[in-house]
UniProtKB/Swiss-Prot annotation:
It is found in: Cytoplasm, Cytoskeleton; Cytoplasm, Cytoskeleton, Microtubule organizing center, Centrosome. SMART domains: LRR_SD22 (SM00365). The keyword Cytoplasm applies. Residues 203-241 form the LRRCT domain. InterPro entries: Leu-rich_rpt, Leu-rich_rpt_4, LRR_dom_sf, SDS22/Internalin_LRR. LRR repeats lie at residues 30-51, 52-71, 72-93, 94-115, 116-137, 146-167, 168-189. May regulate phosphatase activity of protein phosphatase 1 (PP1) complexes. Gene3D superfamilies: Ribonuclease Inhibitor (3.80.10.10). One of its GO terms (molecular function) is tubulin binding. This is Protein phosphatase 1 regulatory subunit 42. GO terms for cellular component: centrosome; cytoplasm; manchette; microtubule cytoskeleton; microtubule organizing center. Pfam families: LRR_4. Its main location: cytoplasm.
Length: 372
C-alpha cells in the first residue's frame, strides 16, 4: 500500500527549493505538475497545500476513491485504477480535462459543478456482464454547456439519444459499442452541429448498407469519420445525387397524383393525415400499396363527378381490387378540392366527394366502366 502524501510529493518533485530556508508551504505552492503514474498508489492524502497544482498524473495505480485533490487542477489523469464512483470533484471549478478510462464506473454522474470541463474520457469501463454504461441526465445537462470531446468506447452502449444535449461536441469517440441504427445517429447528428470528428468503428451500424454515405450526408460539418477524411467534393456529390433522386420521385409522384395535391403530399412530414380516413384495416392495407393511388383517382374527377379519360384503366383496376375492402366503410374524409367534387348542399352525397367514387365504395354500379 502506497499513499500519496506531501512528503512523497517533496521527494519526487522536480521543483527544487530556491533556498534551504524556503518553507514547505512556499515550496509546495510553486509545484504545477505532478506525475505519480504506476506507483502502486491506492490512496491520495491531502494535496490542497499544492495550491498551484494544475496537472496531476495518477494513471495505472490502485486508487479506488477520488478525494483530496487541489482545487486549481485543470488536467486530471486517473485511467486504469479501481474507481467505481465519480465523486468529490465539485470543487475543481477549473478542471478542463478528465481521464477516467479503464476503471469500474457504471454511471457517469457527479460532474454537475465542472462548468469548464472540455474533455471527458471514460472508455473501457470494467462493467458487470450484460450491463452498459449509463448517464445521469442532470450531469449531461450541465456538460452540454462546455463539453467538446467525449470518449465512451467499449462500454456496451446501444443508443445515443440521451447524449443529444451535448450540442457543443466537436469530437466523439464511441468505437466498439453496440450501436445498430442509422436513425439513432441521424437524431444526435442533427443536434451536434459543431461535430468535426467521429469514430464508430467496431459497431454493428458500420455494417449497414451505405453507412458512410448516409452519415456524410446527415452531418454537414463532419470532417473525419472512423479515422478517414471526408472530402468536401465527395459530400457535395452525395448531396447532388440525393437531390436528383428526390426530384425524380417528385416527378413520378406528380404523374400519379396531379400537381394540385403534390406539394401537400410530398412536403408534409405526416402525409398520412392528408390521405382519406378509412376503417383501420383498410387504411393499413392501402398504405402498403402505392400510397397515392386513390388520390390519383379523385384528382381525375371533374365538376360533374365523372372520371376523365386521362385516368385510364390503371386507376379503375386498382379500385376494383380494393372495392371489397371499402364496402361498409362509415367515414371518409379526403383532401379533394371542392371544385373537383359534387354533393354537399346540391346533392344527397356527403359534401366534397365525387359521385362515381362514392357509388363505387358503396358497391353500386361503376360509372367509369367503358372508359378506354
Amino acid at each position: 500500500m502506497v499513499r500519496l502524501t506531501v512528503d512523497l510529493v517533496m521527494k519526487n518533485s522536480n521543483v527544487l527549493r530556491n533556498r534551504k530556508d524556503e518553507s514547505l508551504a512556499r515550496h509546495l505552492r510553486r509545484i504545477t505538475h505532478l506525475n505519480f503514474s504506476n506507483k502502486n498508489i491506492d490512496e491520495v492524502e491531502d494535496l490542497t497545500m499544492c495550491r498551484n497544482l494544475t496537472v496531476l498524473y495518477l494513471y495505472d495505480n490502485n486508487i479506488n476513491q477520488i478525494k483530496n485533490l487541489g482545487s486549481n487542477l485543470t488536467h486530471l489523469y486517473l485511467q486504469n485504477n479501481c474507481i467505481s464512483c465519480i465523486e468529490n470533484l465539485s470543487g475543481l471549478k477549473r478542471l478542463e480535462k478528465l481521464y477516467l478510462g479503464g476503471n469500474c464506473l457504471t454511471v457517469v454522474e457527479g460532474l454537475e459543478g465542472l462548468r469548464e470541463l472540455r474533455e471527458l474520457h471514460i472508455e473501457n469501463q470494467r462493467l458487470p456482464p450484460g450491463e452498459k454504461l449509463l448517464f445521469d441526465p442532470r450531469t449531461l445537462h450541465f456538460l452540454g454547456i462546455s463539453l467538446s470531446v467525449l470518449n465512451i468506447s467499449n462500454n456496451n452502449i446501444d443508443e445515443l439519444k440521451d447524449l443529444a444535449v451535448l450540442e457543443n461536441l466537436t469530437q466523439f469517440v464511441a468505437a466498439d459499442n453496440q450501436l445498430k441504427e442509422i436513425k439513432d445517429l441521424e437524431f444526435v447528428l442533427s443536434k451536434w452541429t459543431k461535430l468535426c470528428r467521429m469514430d464508430l468503428s467496431g459497431n454493428p451500424v458500420c455494417l449497414k448498407p451505405k453507412y458512410r454515405e448516409k452519415v456524410t450526408i446527415i452531418s454537414k460539418t463532419l470532417e473525419i469519420l472512423d479515422g478517414k477524411e471526408i472530402k468536401e467534393m465527395a459530400r457535395q456529390f452525395l448531396l447532388n445525387w440525393k437531390a436528383s433522386r428526390i426530384s425524380k420521385k417528385k416527378k413520378n409522384l406528380e404523374n400519379m397524383t396531379g400537381p394540385s395535391l403534390l406539394p401537400q403530399l410530398y412536403e408534409s412530414d405526416n402525409y398520412r393525415s392528408l390521405l382519406p380516413v378509412y376503417n383501420q384495416n383498410f387504411r393499413h392495407q392501402l398504405l402498403e400499396q402505392p400510397k397515392y393511388i386513390v388520390m390519383a383517382h379523385t384528382q381525375s374527377c371533374n365538376k360533374h363527378g365523372q372520371l376523365q379519360r386521362s385516368a385510364g384503366k390503371r386507376n379503375i383496376s386498382v379500385i376494383e381490387d380494393i372495392k371489397s375492402e371499402a364496402r361498409g366503410m362509415e367515414s371518409f374524409s379526403g383532401c379533394i378540392p371542392e371544385s373537383e367534387c359534387v354533393g354537399g348542399q346540391h346533392g344527397n352525397e356527403r359534401p366534397g366527394y365525387p359521385t362515381n367514387l362514392i357509388n363505387l365504395w358503396k358497391g353500386e354500379k361503376d360509372e367509369t366502366e367503358g372508359i378506354p
